[in-house]
Amino acid sequence: MTTPRWRLILNGKSAGNDELRDAVGHWRGQGVQLEVRVTWEDGDAERYVAEAIDHGVDVIVAAGGDGTLSAVAETLAHREELADALPSLALIPMGTANDFATAAGIPTEPKEAFALIGQATPHAIDLLRVDADGTQWWCANLASGGFGTQVTVETDAGLKKMLGGLAYVITGIAKLGRIEPITARLSGPDFAWEGDFIALGIGNGRQAGGGQQLCPQALIDDGLLDVTVLPELEGEVTATLGQMLKSGTQAALEQLATRARLPWLEIASERPLTLNLDGEPVQARQFRIECVPGRVRMHLPAGCPLLGG
């Protein structure tokens, strides 16, 4: 039997985690050839993924939050090989919010998350390809704009380390009453929307910003992206955002949002618009976002809510 070869790409912020260290030791004891690489700066994930492919690794394990997952997935997506010819992808949730992992039902314990590699045949999943004023990006989970993006971008790193997802809520409450709507034009196949919005979600996955379920019905294997637009609500803004922060976005979105499910979406804004791509703020006036079906293969739990079949 061939020895399993896994490569762990670990966000440097979690390098001292004892549970992860124990999990690595456990799987090495089970006969897995498991090497660890730690990211400290931009470009590390790309370099480590290329190295893993050159070494013939079977599985690349991203250990970190949504940004780490996205960085590894983006590097795989940039490759010329098809998904079947690339290493499969696994995730150990170790970020602040872990939005993708939460929605997918991936265990938070490192040893259990590692176990999915052996228990679950990898599924082909979609990724979002984003063109921002001519520059290409990839997004594994969700692109968001408006209020949620401002909260995520402006939340203090120290606060996130101390309070986890609660830090986003505190920052959001502090910003209530200071939210300026964004004017944009959105278009896609048989879809057009123009006006002022306070929140925008384009989902491969379902949630971002520490649990904001902007695209609650999104699937990562349907070849489509889910769009949710929350328009400007004039005098109701503060009350509505307060409800979203206290009880989650679901109730407010059901009544107020415009939704669509599309293979691609174009966004045009007269002023520079910031989209948060899995934690990476990207600013442009013109965006084109496409769902690329089955771009990578990922180990996910049985009954994963993000899979349609």
Curated annotation (Swiss-Prot):
Q: Which residues form the active site?
A: E280
Q: List the GO molecular function terms.
A: ATP binding; lipid kinase activity; magnesium ion binding
Is Mitochondrion there in the keyword field?
no
Q: Where in the cell is it found?
A: Cytoplasm
Query: Which positions bind ATP?
Result: T39, G65, D66, G67, T68, L69, S70, A71, T96
Family annotation (Pfam families): DAGK_cat (PF00781), YegS_C (PF19279)
Q: Which UniProt keywords apply?
A: ATP-binding, Cytoplasm, Kinase, Lipid biosynthesis, Lipid metabolism, Magnesium, Metal-binding, Nucleotide-binding, Phospholipid biosynthesis, Phospholipid metabolism, Transferase
Q: Which domain of life is it from?
A: Bacteria
Q: Which parts of the sequence belong to the DAGKc domain?
A: 1-134
Instruction: Describe cofactor binding as the record notes it.
Output: Binds 1 Mg(2+) ion per subunit. Ca(2+) may be able to substitute.
Q: Which GO terms describe its biological process?
A: phospholipid biosynthetic process
Determine if Magnesium is one of this entry's keywords: yes
The EC number on file is 2.7.1.-
Q: Which residues bind Mg(2+)?
A: L219, D222, L224
Q: What is its main location?
A: cytoplasm
Provide the function of this protein.
Probably phosphorylates lipids; the in vivo substrate is unknown.
Regarding protein family, the annotation reads: Belongs to the diacylglycerol/lipid kinase family. YegS lipid kinase subfamily.
Q: Which NCBIfam families does this entry report, sorted A to Z?
A: lip_kinase_YegS, PRK13054.1, YegS/Rv2252/BmrU family lipid kinase
Protein name per UniProt: Probable lipid kinase YegS-like
Report the source organism. Stenotrophomonas maltophilia (strain K279a)
